[in-house]
UniProtKB/Swiss-Prot annotation:
Transmembrane regions: 15-35, 80-100
Signal sequence interval, chain numbering: none
Organism: Methylocella silvestris (strain DSM 15510 / CIP 108128 / LMG 27833 / NCIMB 13906 / BL2)
Database matches in NCBIfam families: mscL, PRK00567.1-4, PRK13952.1
UniProt protein name: Large-conductance mechanosensitive channel
Described function: Channel that opens in response to stretch forces in the membrane lipid bilayer. May participate in the regulation of osmotic pressure changes within the cell.
Localization of this protein: Cell inner membrane
Amino acid sequence: MLKEFKEFALRGNLIDLAIGFIIGAAFSGLVQSVVNDIIMPIVGRITGGVDFSNLYWQLSGAPQPTLALARQAGATIAYGNFITLLINFLIVAFVLFLAVKALNKVTPKPDPASTQPPKQEVLLEQIRDLLARK
C-alpha cells in the first residue's frame, strides 16, 4: 500500500499541481501587496485621501471612527474591504488571462489533417456502414 501511495504521490500531475498551488499562494501574496501597498494608496490619493480599509456602513449603534471599533459596537458592512478584494480579484483574473493567452500562443496546435482515428474506429465505421446498407 505504501508503494502504491508513493507511485501516486510522485506522478507528474500531482507534483505539477502541488507546485502550481505553491506558486499560486506566493502570487496571491504578491498581488495583495501590489493592491494594498501601491494601487489603493494611489486610489486613495485620487479620491481625496480616502482610506478604503475604513469604509463601512454602521448598521447598529453610534458611528465609530474605525472599522474595528464599529465591528465591536455591532453589525457593519465593510464595503471598503470589499472594494479592495474586488480590485485584488480583478488583477489576479487579468494576469491569469494573460498567462493563458500567452500559453495558447506558445503551445503548438495539432494539425487536423495529421490526426487520424485509430484503426479500430475506422474498422467499426466500415462495419457500421456495411450493416446500414443491408
